[in-house]
A protein has these predicted regions:
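General small-molecule cofactor/ligand-binding pocket signal
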Residues: 126-129
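AMP-binding/adenylate-forming catalytic core of the ANL superfamily
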Residues: 3, 8-9, 16-19, 31-120, ...
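Acidic/polar alpha-helix N-cap and adjacent early helical turns
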Residues: 147-153
Length: 153
């Protein structure tokens, strides 16, 4: 890996300085917690966190679980609008070549997540796609998925 260095301000960008720097601290936008043994656990980006049914849900944990299923080549977890709950967890999934999209597979994946973590974290919506939107460096563009979802509604 590479060392990350932070300068004392953004060059010619006062709005970004005001957003990121508060009381002498740089706010990265990453969220983590410390467990009872003193270990830190990465939850995810603040802008990617999902607030659903009163819980804060990080996409990384659910994505990691789904990636263990043999049908999942890659996936992205985002929030989707829900008329009753406000927001729900949505999984956008690219399948491996031996699997085809189906309601049965979606249900299997939902149950797979339920068995591996707290039941409230399971994706209530599963969408199968051919590919996920990515940056040039290969990072998934969750913001683009959310934007596409809001344009559909």
């Amino acid at each position: 890996g590479s060392e990350m260095c932070i300068r004392d301000r953004y060059y010619r960008n006062p709005a970004e300085n005001d957003r990121a720097w508060r009381y002498g601290f740089y706010h990265t936008g990453d969220t983590a917690y410390m467990d009872e043994d003193g270990y830190y656990w990465y939850v995810g980006r603040t802008d990617d966190l999902i607030k659903a049914s009163g819980y804060r849900i990080g996409p990384f944990e659910i994505e990691s679980i789904l990636m263990e299923h043999p049908s999942v080549l890659e996936c992205a977890i985002t929030a989707a609008d829900d008329p009753i709950r406000g927001k729900v967890v949505k999984a956008t999934i690219v399948l491996t070549k031996n699997y085809k999209p189906s309601d049965e597979l979606a249900k299997e994946l939902q149950n797979y997540v339920k068995r591996s973590t707290a039941p409230y974290k399971y994706p209530r919506i599963v969408e199968f796609v051919d590919e996920l939107p990515k940056t040039i460096s290969g990072k998934i563009k969750r913001g683009e998925i959310r934007k596409n979802d809001s344009e559909k509604n």
